[in-house]
């Protein structure tokens, strides 16, 4: 058993607790990763607050990056010493996985949010030897070591800074993939992006890569809106001071070709649909608590408008994460501008700063 140090969510909506844990050796199809860093994502906080019913106590974290330390006997594509970014989990066996859409895996929710392996076990034990929930996105990377699978580990070139790339496995691939893999705007298109967090900012950068000539960002934070311009936005709207739908239609006279809702707010969801032109497509990527409802004008869809939900940017991580790294190398995806680093011991401060809007993408460094 490997000894590790982890942040554990023990109670609903309470600060995480730093504790020593034990981690079992990897099974035949698993790998043990020495975590170098892990991004903090909105979904981690939704689960901490039990918006998704993952059993507590639980080790969260799903934007991990690190070095492979051990591999199971059936692992063929990775060896100890490989650098990896960890992404979402999928079964690899269902029809969706076998036809190239693992983000629609029939066991997606179970694999990522069950808190255990499919057989009900978990490789994580507390200091008293009691099994606690983990396997979060098949990684639980708010820890110095994590068990993952070969499927959700993306091999990365060793000249790429490991501490930086973890968020590519979830939040950044979600925003960028929503644009490049799902909406697929043609050069010259217009897009409105609601929410200038990590997902929204990644979407801004991807919209510029795609050749959109009108990129409108809506948020409540002026500093974030200024940064949005720096990474590619052509227009910004502070929704505290302006009617966002009206302002968007003043910029794009007939409404925008595409919109992306990244806030998980039902009110903003309505605005993201209402600002569309005819036809137009709204992508929904905000991570709302289960049971959240929103209202829309059904008449909007009589004129060719489309609403599409986007999971993990409709990305195949082994293909898309390296693509994003290449865009970063070229200076076209400067996601490092979004990042602030924290030590694992400061995880609760990192979450507070993220929720307050002070920081866009916190990344936790592990002290080994």
Regions found by a protein language model. Give the residues of each.
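NAD(P)H dinucleotide-binding glycine-rich loop of Rossmann-like/cofactor-binding domains
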Residues: 23, 95-194
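Adenosine-nucleotide cofactor-binding segment
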Residues: 193-196, 205-271
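C-terminal hydrophobic helical "lid"/dimerization subdomain
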Residues: 1-2, 270-274, 318-368
